[in-house]
């Protein structure tokens, strides 16, 4: 009896289970209802996940449509980051939730952007690194190896995408302290700290999404806005550091 009580006491409570689970199925209904929910989850998410993992195909947002701010985005990001951290171990220096879904009260495409920091970007090209991220559900996206800087230069990175059809996510792998790494963090912090900047970005995204329904075209169209915002971000950064 004591052994049984110890096992029960060691079990995760409901809050811990919710924090760790991508999906929760309510078993308060009938066994038939639960079986139906399990079958639906299997067919709509688990089977497509496995097939995409085998083929190396990432999930992508169907459109550029903006979703209302979702208070669960940070928790979803935390689960994904924990999975990545477990897969990569000490090869990772830092893990960050970035992009619009990391900014409270900001409408966004329902796509979680994550930043994985490494000591040197060459580490991200190692076969084991790529394979371990893929095994965790994040496959390498070929042909995406940099961001464009305002001055015409490029900021190296690697991109991985989630294969989960129920959670589109982009994983940006950058060297910690590189210009691209710092810009992503500073941009997030600027929008969190400055409601006017956040709302201006929201308005710009809504206007661009109305003109560019394709996600790729929408992302390309945002480049000009980012170039225009770069000076304002640098001004904010300088004021914060002074």
Model-identified regions with their sequence ranges:
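Catalytic cores of NTP-dependent nucleotidyl/adenyl transfer enzymes across multiple folds
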Residues: 173-242
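Helical scaffold of the NTase/Pol beta-like nucleotidyltransferase catalytic core
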Residues: 40-96
